[in-house]
């Protein structure tokens, strides 16, 4: 009997960061860079209230949350699109802009989801080598061809924790062709406190060929609710809305996210906690001669090759 056959999907499967935690070997799960303190108590309270009424569909465009985001960051509400996590925004970008034989440039050690969605939409992924685990603007520019369509940059980067300076990322956009879409992933920007760093939203909010994405999964502690968003020109956002699934973010998630973004005190508490403990861990690893990156985010990258040599 001949059965239905799926088309050839030229992409690797995303494997969630459960590692040894799922096997109950690890006591604390660290592999997904989730919030240390969890969600704001105000967000939890609003989520519980909203969870008592499931019979109504959510606002398909998430108008209330988009309005809250726009007010918080002084943005144009009509240029905001919500996703079921920022992952979905990346998926929509790839669906809307990529065709067969297009090329997408990603950094050598970048978030895997960029290349998964690029390949699923028939694009060729080009890997720009990194310098000491840091994305190189010159190397990225050297990878550009007449087929380049999108460049994905996480700044700061996951999983390395390194970043591209303000001047260098502006240089990247300036030297790219205007028809190449630059996507800047701001997932971890809130933790950064370095003079030569600036978030994508502040640098590119007025650009018509840049999409900046953000998430509620990290510093806001709402990873289980799946809420992310993108900010781009009206033309780009209109294209994404044409293919965005209806009701893609559930109502309790929308309401909890709106409460979370307003709770500045809780946000600052999380930032203080992360900065305090990342410095402590860095100093401990250094004392033990374990090589790691000095980071401005909520995770550390450890070189286990050096750890092995040290232990020997």
PLM region spans:
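N-terminal "arm"/small-domain region of PLP-dependent enzymes with the aminotransferase-like
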Residues: 1-56, 68
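Phosphate-binding glycine-rich loop
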Residues: 63-103
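PLP-dependent aminotransferase-like
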Residues: 96-153
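Active-site pre-lysine segment of PLP-dependent enzymes
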Residues: 119, 137-146, 159-182, 186-219
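Short beta-strands and strand-loop turn motifs
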Residues: 127-128, 150-156, 182-186, 293-295
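PLP-dependent aminotransferase class I/II
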Residues: 209-285, 290-293
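Conserved PLP-binding catalytic core of the aspartate aminotransferase-like
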Residues: 285-312
């Amino acid at each position: 009997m001949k059965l239905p056959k799926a088309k050839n999907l030229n992409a690797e499967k995303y494997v969630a960061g459960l590692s040894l935690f799922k096997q109950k070997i690890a006591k604390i799960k660290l592999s997904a860079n989730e919030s240390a303190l969890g969600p704001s108590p105000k967000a939890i309270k609003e989520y519980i209230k909203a969870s008592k009424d499931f019979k109504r569909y959510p606002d398909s465009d998430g108008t209330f949350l988009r309005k809250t985001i726009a007010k918080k960051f002084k943005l144009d509400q009509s240029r905001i699109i919500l996703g079921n996590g920022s992952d979905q925004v990346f998926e929509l970008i790839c669906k809307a802009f990529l065709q067969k034989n297009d090329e997408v440039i990603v950094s050598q050690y970048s978030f895997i989801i960029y290349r998964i969605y690029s390949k699923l939409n028939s694009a060729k992924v080009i890997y720009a080598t990194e310098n000491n685990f840091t994305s190189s603007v010159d190397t990225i520019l050297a990878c550009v061809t007449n087929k380049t369509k999108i460049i994905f940059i996480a700044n700061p980067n996951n999983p390395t924790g390194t970043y591209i300076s303000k001047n260098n990322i502006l240089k990247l956009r300036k030297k790219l062709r205007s028809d190449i879409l630059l996507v800047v992933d701001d997932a971890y920007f809130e933790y950064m406190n370095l003079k030569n760093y600036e978030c994508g939203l502040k640098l590119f909010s007025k650009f018509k060929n840049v999409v900046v994405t953000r998430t509620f999964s990290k510093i806001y502690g709402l990873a289980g609710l799946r809420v992310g968003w993108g900010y781009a020109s009206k033309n780009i956002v209109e294209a994404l809305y044409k293919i965005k699934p209806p009701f893609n973010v559930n109502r309790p998630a929308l309401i909890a996210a709106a409460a979370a973004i307003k709770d500045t005190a809780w946000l600052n508490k999380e930032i203080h906690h992360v900065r305090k403990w990342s410095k402590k861990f860095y100093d401990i690893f250094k004392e033990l001669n374990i090589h790691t990156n000095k980071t401005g985010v909520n995770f550390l990258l450890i070189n286990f090759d050096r750890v092995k040599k040290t232990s020997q």
